[in-house]
Amino acid sequence: MEISALQIARAAYQPKLPKALQGPVKAVEGEATQSVGNQEEIKALFPNTYGMPVITFEAGEKKELPAFNVGVILSGGQAPGGHNVISGLFDGVKALNPKNKLYGFILGPGGLVDHNYMEITSEIMDQYRNTGGFDIIGSGRTKLEKEEQFEKGIEILRELGIKALVIIGGDDSNTNACVLAEYYAAKKYGVQVIGCPKTIDGDLKNEQIETSFGFDTACKTYAELIGNIQRDCNSARKYWHFIKLMGRSASHIALECALQTQPNVCLISEEIEAKEMSLDDVVTYIAKVVADRAADGNHFGTVLIPEGLIEFIPAIKKLIAELNEVLTDPATGESREFANAEEQIDFVKSSIAKDNLAVLESLPEDVARQLCLDRDPHGNVQVSLIETEKLLSRMVAKKLEAWKEEGKFEGSFSAQHHFFGYEGRCAAPSNYDADYCYSLGFNASCLIANGKTGYMSVIKNTTAPAAEWIAGGVPITMMMNIERRNGANKPVIRKALVELDGAPFKFFAAHREEWAKNSCYVYPGPVQYWGPTEVCDQPTKTLKLEQGK
């Protein structure tokens, strides 16, 4: 395999560890924990793994441990740093006993169920250190939810002599890890399950998890591209760039990219929902910024749009909820079948409430058809297929035309469209993510060595130098509550949304009027791996603002 000069040089980078993990450790137990919501229900569902204490690791004395094997799974969408979680786990497991083995299950949780695996040797591991992607073993979206899956899993775990399984994933994957840990504990199978927090969307965080890995690198990658567009925008001075960014459930990426690049407009889904703004309100807000800048002779600008914006507009959210109900067959839980598209649209229009029908008919015809017709296998609207950036620019253009006829707008408006998603998922990890991910993996090996199960590996205090980071573990049940998913109440890890009273949003809100009126663009440039600390090792602005740095 031919590799680039950068990858060769980057392979030599030795990720930094918290001081506590640089030698033998001892586990210090805190108070018993409770779930963030629905305590009685969660306790009843997880009697063997509920109420466990938070763990903090400190320097300890070396212990001789018998050899054991560990399995690892990459679950869900890719995020920069996944390979470093595995390399940290590999090095940690080998440090405990050189005879220990690490097995990777191929293409996600499905590899566990289908008994598809490989041993990760030092020769294989060394090819992937400090690289982006999940290609060492691949990833998948199989959900571990059924007892037959758990039983198929234990067959191969026993065959390979695996004592512990590490699941690297987001909120849904770690919810499944918690369910699996509880099942194996209840059955007394003797297999530990540990989670590691991953998602570039940044929505797996709470008082215990400062950030999910990959968020830092992905945001810096998108911010470079936005900065490049803004430099072009300020050079040609004739286009408005509508840029959609990943983040269906939360607007963390859009907010962080705004803090890094200072665009003219950044929409925050959570604010739009809180203010109960309509789609027309959003369009009017953007159009006013365009008109005000045009009055100053600036016929250009940038608009950042979170991927999930549409689902946060209350009227459309209500419409989508009813569409999901009427287009799902209650008998099967699957999508209803129709002879043709027109029959389906007629059924929708005759089935939904009048206020929802009015919202549907207010949308551009192609978007309304898309909402009615594009479904997933469960009958749910495929919101991610809606090109929100194009929808908004078309509606802004229409409003500006109306204003021009009324004499309220003089100027030109020409739009360009972008969607940044896959560009950031497999980028080579920043120094922050390389260190953070390696520490998460190494820390997971310490949780295994201390006999823990149903825990998530956590590293805190990450705005400080790596030596001062705090390593430990948190019971996954602590992060859970009951939510309605696909028509049923289920225990899930609560997603973290942008907090409108939090420091990152408040900083943005205090500056956005100035950024809207003036061209205050910042050009972050590409992720840097070598050079001064202020260039190479800085965490996200979100994290620094949250910690008052």
Say what each PLM segment does.
Residues 79-89, 112-113, 145-150, 171-179, ...:
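Short glycine/serine/threonine-rich phosphate/pyrophosphate-binding segments
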Residues 100, 164-169, 175-192, 207-412:
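Accessory alpha-helical/coil subdomains and C-terminal extensions
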Residues 75-77, 105-110, 141-142, 170-171, ...:
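Short, ordered loop/turn segments at secondary-structure junctions
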Residues 24, 30-63, 112-163, 200, ...:
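Glycine-rich oxoanion-binding loops at beta->alpha junctions
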Residues 1-18, 63-113:
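N-terminal phosphate-binding or glycine-rich loops at protein starts, especially the Walker A/P-loop
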Residues 65-73, 128-140, 198-210, 235-238, ...:
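Gly-rich Lys/Arg/Thr-decorated short loops/hinges at beta-loop-alpha junctions or inter-strand turns
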Residues 1-23, 316-321, 333-549:
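C-terminal non-catalytic interaction/assembly regions of soluble proteins
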